[in-house]
Structure formats: C-alpha cells, structure tokens
Regions:
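Basic, alpha-helical interaction scaffolds
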Residues: 1-2, 392, 467-536
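Basic/polar low-complexity segments
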Residues: 2-23, 46-165, 454-463, 596-629
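Conserved, non-catalytic sequence blocks in retroelement Pol enzymes and Pol-derived host proteins
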Residues: 22-29, 46-54, 81-82, 119, ...
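Conserved pre-catalytic core of RNA-dependent polymerases
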Residues: 131, 160-370, 407
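Short linear motifs embedded in intrinsically disordered, charge-biased segments
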Residues: 113, 117, 543-675
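Short, conserved micro-motifs composed of acidic
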Residues: 160, 421, 436-474
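Catalytic palm active-site di-aspartate
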Residues: 184, 223-226, 242, 276, ...
Length: 675
C-alpha cells in the first residue's frame, strides 16, 4: 500500500475521454484542402458551368492523391511498429477493409435461475458464483472410487526445498516484466513496477524471502480480477464464457522465482513424465505430434491397427483437488517447510468478476490451480503426472490436459479388448484424482490402411464408464486435423481456407502499403499457416502440395502486384523465397539439429542412432544416421525415416555446426534453401 501511495502522489490516475480518430492520416493541411474542394464542388453543382467543374476536379485529384499518400504512410508505419503482433495487424487490415469486427466486451444479458437479467451488478455476481463453484459441482457429481490417488504413484528418491532468492534474481525479473499486461486489483501497473525496479528490488527481495522462510503467501496476492470472455454460441449462456484472471504483477514475480526453482528440480531429477509435452522447455505441439505419427506409421508398417482415443477432460484446471495436489507434491520430494508455502499459496484464494464496469464481491475458490498464474500450469502437470501409470496396453501423449491414447494390435478383437481395459483403468485414475471426463467430446478413431479399415465392424465399439465413445473418421488435435488414413486432406483443406482468406485481406490493403509492409503482413499472417507443424503433415500427397504452393504463389503475386503472365519462379526469386517443399525440408533439418544436439524431448532423441555407434558421441555428429528399413510405404512417411534422409543429405560442415543459430545461417546460405 505504501508503494501505491507513492504512485498516487507522483503519478495519479486521471480520467480522460478518448475519441478514436476515424482517419488519423488526415492532417490539418489536408482538411483545409478538403474544405476548399467541397466549396468548389458546391459552386459547380449550383452553376453547372463546365469551367467550375474543371476548377473543382483539379483540387479534388490533388486532395485524393494527398490522402492516399498520407494514408499509405500511416499504415506503413503502423504495420512496421506492430510487426510480430498478428492481432494488431488484423485489426488494421479490418479497418482498411471496412469490416466491422469490433470485439465488444460488454455483456448485454445472461440467463440466471431467476430468469434473464441485464443488470451489471447481478451479472457480475452470477458469473463470479458460476466460475468459483464449477469445480466443486463437477467433483460432487463423481461416484465413489475403489482406488486412491497413491495407487498410481511410483517411488521418488529426491527431495526439494525452496531456497531464499538473491537480489540479482529479483532485479532481473523486474527488468524483464512485460508492460502490456492488465493491472490487477492492487492497481499497481506492470509498467510502473518495471520502471521503479532499481528502487524497489531490495525491499521486494526481502518480502519474497520472508514469504519463503515463513511459508506464507500474502493474502493480498491471492485475489484475482476475472473478466468473462465469450467463446462461441449463445451470448446469454454462462457456460459459453471463459474466465480471464488478472493477478498482481508483484505476486507473479514471486511465483516466477518459485517456479524456476521447482521446474529446475523436476527437470534435473527427470520427475516429469516423458509423455507430457505441455509447458516444458524444448517441447511443443510439433514434437508431440511427431511422436504420435511416428508410432502410428510404425504400427501400420508392421500391419497393426491403431486405435486413438482423444480424451477431453471437463474443466481440468478448475477441478484440481488441493488436498491431493499437496500430497503429490510431498510424494515428489517437497520438504515440509516448502509444502507449507504451497499450502498457503493455494488456500483462501478469492476472485471478483468484472462485468460492464461493475466488480462483484469476492468469493473463495476451493479447488483448481490458480488461473492466470505462473505456477498454475506447472502444478497441473504435477497433478496429472502419474496418469500414464494407469495404462497397461497403451501409450498416452499429453499436452497439458490435451491427451490422446494410442493402442495397437493386428487383431481388431484384441485391440478393442485392450482399449476398453485401459479406458477402465483411466476411469479408475480419474475417479481417484477427482477429475471428470467429458464423454460427449471424447472421440475414438482407428488409424490404419484402407484394407484394415474396411474390415472393422461397427460392433467394434469402445466404452468408458459404461458409455460408448463416439467413433470418428477425423479429429482435431493440437491444431492439426488428423484423419483415419493419415492422408492430411482435411488439414490441407483447413489451411487452404485460412490462407485464401488472409490473401484476400492482403490484396485489399495492398494499395495502401508498400512492398516491405506487404511482406511483413505475409510473414505475420500467412507464412505461419503454412509452417505450423508442417513437418508433421509433410507426407501429404503431390496434389495437396501443389495446391498449397499455388496459394503461396498467389500471395507472392499480391505482394509484388504482378499478374499471372509472370512466372511464379521469377516472383519467388524476387522475394527470396524457396518453394514450400524446400521450406518444409529446411524446417525438418532444423528439427533434426535440435534432436541430435540435445534440444528436444527424450521421446524424439531415442528414435535416432548413428551408424558408427562405437565412436565418442561428441565426435560423430557429422556421420550418417541409421536409416530405418521399411516394410511398406507407411514407415517412409514417418519423421523417423524422412528426418534421417534429410540429415544424411546435409554437408559434413553443416552437420558439425553446434550452434543452432549458426546451423540456420549456414542452412539458409545453401542454394537449395533460399528462405
């Protein structure tokens, strides 16, 4: 409060009405010229003399040219300053295209038990009650379990205790605070915390260390401001909103200090499951999907059927049981003093919901990891860390709460039996850990050859908790649409649709921006659509690859403002682009470098082996990797096969580049990689 008092004294908040300028490029000189132009137009209309019309047309053209010039300059600077910020770039594109995409955060009405209401006070209280009670209500609906959480835990022999933090650690975090984050209920902006960091770091360091020593997390830091954000469907339904929690900036600095220590301990002792790819260094959606597709292709190469269950957990982050979480933290080696701190961190958390400017009263949150926090995601990973231990016949892959479970067998009868057995085991684990499965959103898909898929009977059904899991022919996982034949047709359809829309936007704004800005838009909005997990679906068919390349050529024509009479190869040369196929090859090479030089998950490292395994590891990066021997074309489509082929084709000097940045630089300089 003392810090806030100083802020209020020297930088008091002042209310100011902000009127958005509809045309900020219209300067005073242009406005004066517009007035003169309009006067001449009025005269010409009144007299209808050809001389008056001629006198009007010349200044009209001058004004229009000047407006176009200043508008172009305005957007050029705007796009340049917002490079790497897709949201801001899209906002500007929508302005130029006159598309009404205003995201109104106001909520007109919601349905309550007493009927529909438009009162901000009632709506804020209703949302707050809904968000704080949803976890408890889901837990109350769960049936009793025959097992307990500890039945699935494996022994741990390491220990962890929070140490006191140094002034250097605190100062570093304060100086790196992002200044664009919303302000919490303590009303202390991140920007002011960052600016005053040299003067407050020592005091904050003492406060943080007092918290660690005493095992008490300050109560004032445990209250969140929650803003309901509409997701989709009806706007008056509570369950169509997600809560955005805003916490104190200073509390998040404290959390980051603790997070760094805990994450280092878990990583050093390899306590986090190898199946988990969410919120972890060197892990990503791409690595998780590569691991999955590698297994699916390998199974198909052996003549096996794959069954994949895409599990949907109901409000998983909101339903974490605090008692079980603390016991699991103890199991993973946290000392009593450290456990006391985490208990204080979780206990007595409150939140207030803000709707249309009205802030609700505070309500206590009894379960779940703190939303919007630094520690919340890591605590969730610890909570579900032992999930893989419940499965006997299947391989799970987790990205936070996004989970898929793969089972394989040559026999459909055995496969169904194995899947159903493991789903029973999964249900036991969920009940023991007081988590709920959303059966209606959980999907099951067989992935196999056409011949094998045709032999699967409709009677080969999968069940969980006596409820049938819906079988699908395609499913979206981690932003990628996966189909039962791994043809990638549906995913390419989705990418093509998004790219076409983005190119349309680029074409409409092109006349207002220069070539450099157009390239910035391409790099921010279009190229990422082609790049996202591209090495996962790189086994796409020739016609699909051609379809994507044509779209990229269209984007190049829009940037260069050239027609179809100009060859695509000339446009790519002008822009310094390679083909998308070469770009995917480049991305695959970079991923292989990360794997072989230790910057990737264990599950990918173990897929690759050097031909001469007798030499010292640090001397054989330049040697070739062992190329798997496929029985069918399926294994040839896998990353374990194509990745080896790409790496082995690289020059020795390039494979010897230890630094990833040096590797990328040298890779780009090769004639076959022009990007």
């Amino acid at each position: 409060m003392m810090f806030l008092g100083v802020i209020n004294k020297h930088a008091p908040l002042k209310k100011k009405r902000i009127r958005n300028k509809k045309s900020p490029w219209l300067n005073a000189g242009i406005k004066r010229s517009m007035i003169e132009r309009d006067k001449l137009k009025s005269t010409a209309i009144r007299t209808n003399f050809s001389e008056d019309w001629s006198n009007y047309k010349k200044p009209k053209n001058r004004v229009n040219n000047k407006i176009k010039e200043t508008k172009t300059q305005y957007y050029k600077e705007h796009f340049r300053s917002n490079s790497g910020k897709p949201r801001e770039i899209w906002k500007s594109i929508n302005e130029v295209m006159s598309r009404n995409t205003k995201n109104d955060s106001n909520i007109n009405s919601i349905k309550t038990n007493a009927g529909s209401t438009t009162s901000p006070e009632v709506m804020s209280e209703t949302f707050n009650k809904y968000f704080t009670e949803i976890g408890d209500k889901l837990a109350d609906k769960l049936p009793d379990s025959t097992k307990i959480y500890s039945d699935f835990l494996l022994p741990v022999n390491s220990t962890f205790q929070l140490r006191q933090v140094s002034l250097a650690e605190v100062l570093k975090l304060l100086k790196n605070l992002p200044t664009n984050k919303a302000t919490g209920l303590d009303k202390i902006p991140c920007r002011l915390v960052k600016l005053s960091s040299p003067f407050i770091a020592d005091s904050l360091c003492n406060i943080f260390n007092m918290s660690i020593i005493s095992g008490i997390f300050p109560l004032e830091w445990k209250v969140a401001k929650v803003i309901p954000i509409h997701k989709d469907n009806e706007k008056d339904e509570l369950n169509n909103y997600r809560p955005i929690s805003i916490l104190s900036a200073i509390s998040k600095v404290m959390e980051r200090l603790v997070y760094n220590q805990l994450y280092e301990y878990l990583s050093k002792n390899e306590l986090l499951s190898k199946c988990q790819s969410g919120f972890r260094h060197s892990h990503s959606t791409t690595t998780s999907l590569l691991d999955a597709t590698n297994e699916w292709y390998a199974n198909m190469d052996q003549g096996n059927l794959n069954s994949v269950v895409f599990v949907d957990l109901s409000k998983a982050f909101d339903t974490v049981n605090h008692s079980i979480l603390l016991k699991k933290l103890s199991h993973y080696g946290l000392h009593a003093e450290t456990l006391k701190w985490f208990n204080s961190y979780l206990a007595e958390r409150r939140q207030q919901s803000l709707v249309n400017g009205y802030l609700s009263s505070a309500k206590t949150i009894k379960c779940g990891v703190p939303q919007g926090s630094i520690l919340g995601p890591l605590l969730f990973l610890i909570y579900i860390n032992d999930l893989p231990n419940c499965l006997k016949h299947s391989n799970p892959r987790m990205f936070a709460d996004d989970t898929n479970i793969t089972t394989s067998s040559k026999s459909i009868t055995k496969l169904v039996q194995f899947v159903n057995t493991d789903l029973d085991n999964l249900n036991d684990w969920l009940l023991a850990n007081k988590l709920s499965l959303n059966v209606t959103k959980t999907e099951q898909m067989y992935i196999a050859s056409d011949n094998s898929l045709n032999k699967i009977s409709d009677l080969a059904t999968i069940h969980l908790a006596n409820k049938q899991i819906r079988r699908v022919k395609k499913s979206k996982s981690l932003g990628i649409t996966i189909d039962e034949r791994l043809s990638w047709t549906d995913h390419i359809d989705m990418v093509s649709k998004k790219v076409s829309s983005a190119i349309g936007g680029l074409r409409q704004v092109r006349s207002f921006i220069n070539k450099e800005t157009a390239i910035t838009i391409y790099n921010s909005l279009i190229q990422p659509l082609f790049d996202y997990c591209d090495i996962v679906w790189d086994s796409l068919g020739a016609s699909q690859a051609k379809r994507l390349q044509k779209l990229n050529n269209r984007a190049g024509r829009a940037i260069c403002q050239l027609g179809y009479e100009v060859r695509s190869s000339l446009i790519r040369s002008q822009l310094g682009w390679s083909t998308l196929e070469d770009r995917r090859r480049k991305n695959k090479s970079i991923t292989m470098h990360k794997i072989l030089y230790g910057n990737s998950p264990t599950y990918l490292k173990q897929c690759f082996h050097y031909a001469n395994s007798g030499r010292e590891y640090n001397l054989r990066r330049s040697e070739n990797l062992i190329l798997p021997k496929p029985k069918t074309e399926y294994l040839r489509k896998s990353f374990t096969f194509s990745g080896v082929k790409v790496w082995n084709s690289l020059p020795v000097y390039l494979k010897n580049q230890v630094s990833l940045s040096s590797f990328k630089r040298e890779l780009t300089s090769l004639s076959s990689y022009n990007y």
